[in-house]
């Protein structure tokens, strides 16, 4: 059995749908976040998709569980057993000023416009409480994050900054999953962090993975037009 992995979707459900329809033999797919479109909408897909939050989601829809039946949201710090594969995740981005805030208290005030409300919604972040919950999990096969671990250098210039986040490394060191997948940066990368294979996924329109359910060896695939 193989399962699939998608990078950030950003509302490109047409590309996601084509990929899933190309592989009717794949029983389920996982995704590293940023699923919603610019209007906060989610569309059904032809196979189950298990996903963590990115920083671009409709957090009201997630909180109310108002999602298509094929989209299965994985909350931070919890594990799900999917066809014999144990998957857990730490979705969202890192904000140092909010890191010690309880997850339930992350602010999401209503503003005068819809755009301002979205920008003010801090539920896009993960917090220490959720990192500790992830570190306490056991026997995780695949760990999903939206952020990259350190070091992660985006771009090619000489003054590149490390865009990785240390809490991700902390979880990898404690959890030791068999495979780590992340998104956010829209680039396919392969590295090892804390003794764990750590793979950055590209946008759904540019590539995806098929993963062997026994060995967790993967193959990068390029979508067909």
What label would you give each PLM region?
Residues 10, 14, 137-176:
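Active-site-proximal segments of metal-dependent phosphoesterases and phosphodiesterases across multiple
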Residues 10-16, 35-41, 55-62, 78-81, ...:
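Active-site environment of divalent metal-dependent phosphoester hydrolases
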Residues 36-84, 96, 101-117, 121-122, ...:
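Ligand-binding grooves and catalytic loops that recognize ribose/phosphate and carbohydrate rings
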Residues 85-158:
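Active-site-proximal loop/helix segment associated with metal-binding centers of metalloenzymes
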């Amino acid at each position: 059995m193989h399962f699939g992995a998608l990078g950030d979707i950003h509302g490109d459900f047409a590309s996601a749908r084509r990929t899933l329809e190309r592989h009717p033999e794949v029983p389920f797919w996982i995704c590293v976040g940023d699923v919603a479109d610019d209007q906060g909408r989610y569309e059904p897909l032809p196979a189950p998709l298990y996903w963590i939050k990115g920083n671009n989601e409709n957090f009201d829809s997630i909180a109310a569980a108002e999602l298509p039946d094929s989209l299965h949201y994985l909350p931070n710090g919890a594990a799900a057993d999917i066809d014999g594969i144990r998957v857990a995740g730490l979705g969202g981005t890192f904000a140092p000023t909010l890191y010690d805030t309880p997850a339930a208290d992350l602010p999401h005030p209503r503003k005068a416009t819809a755009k301002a409300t979205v920008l003010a919604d801090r539920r896009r972040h993960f917090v220490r409480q959720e990192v500790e919950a992830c570190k306490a999990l056991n026997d995780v096969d695949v760990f999903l994050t939206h952020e990259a671990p350190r070091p992660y250098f985006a771009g090619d210039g000489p003054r590149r900054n490390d865009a990785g986040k240390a809490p991700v490394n902390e979880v990898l060191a404690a959890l030791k999953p068999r495979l780590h997948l992340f998104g956010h940066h829209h680039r396919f990368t392969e590295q090892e962090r804390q003794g764990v294979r750590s793979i950055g996924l590209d946008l759904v329109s540019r590539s995806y993975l098929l993963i062997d359910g026994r060995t967790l060896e993967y193959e990068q695939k390029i979508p067909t037009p």
